[in-house]
Each structure stands twice: as C-alpha cells, then as structure tokens.
C-alpha cells in the first residue's frame, strides 16, 4: 500500500474491499476519504458483481452438474488462518462453471454471491477440486504460517468487478488484464 501511494502520489488512497493476499487481480481503491464509506457499503450490501477465475482439477463426474450453485455455512476453524464448513443455514454462495478443460485441469468461472473469508477456496476444495497451488485447502502446508512461498502462486484471479457508482450513478465494469492459462 505504501508503494502504491508513493507511485501514484495519492496519499489518501485506500482499498474499499479485500482479496486474499495470495489472490491475483483486481482491487478497487477510493481516493477521497469522504466517499470511502459509500463504496465500502456496496461490498457490504452485496451490490458488487464479482467474478473470479481459478485453475483446478477437472472432474468428469461433476461435468454434468455445471453450472453449480454452491452454498454452505463457513466459519473459522480451530486451525490458524483456516476456515471450514459447518452445519447450519448457508452464509456463503458461489456460482461455479467450467470455462475450458485441458487434460486433468480446468479453468473455472466463479461468481460470488457473498464474500466470506476464503469462500472460493473452501467451496472448490469441498467439491473435490481444490484450486491449483492452494497451500491452505484442503491441507494446510506447514510453511504457510511462518514463511509465505510465492514460487508457485495460487491459481485464483479476481477477474471482474461491476457496480453502480454510489456518487455519480454511473455503471462501472472493470476487468483485469491478467489471465490464468491452462
């Protein structure tokens, strides 16, 4: 954040939402402190359409179920930094579809209905298709807590954001130029 403020010269720059540190792609920022809450409210109120891409194993037995509307209840687990599914009313939902298949891997489109911590990672892992290079799901790798290893990045990309601007009323649709390749 410090480097971004220095490179743009905008000291008031602040993120209006969060993505996991390991996730690549779009993050929206607010320049004016007086507008920040209005933009953050869009995310709190689920008024932002968020689309991600992920590379994960292809499972032929799931192919006929796509698109899948996956819902579950996600809560913090007893394991540091890890979330898990528990019984109860769903508090998270994701639409999952296949974009492309190449051998044992597929690129998936993930549309968030909610934005729980690690939601996409938990949902994909629960379906038996954990995101490629995920060092937390399904099994927490020992070095994750003490030493972040980015040599094999998580194959999860925040690809699109769209919303109606709460200040101007204009419709915005932002795309990441990054892409995940099979």
Predicted segments, located by residue:
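RNA pseudouridine synthases
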Residues: 1-182
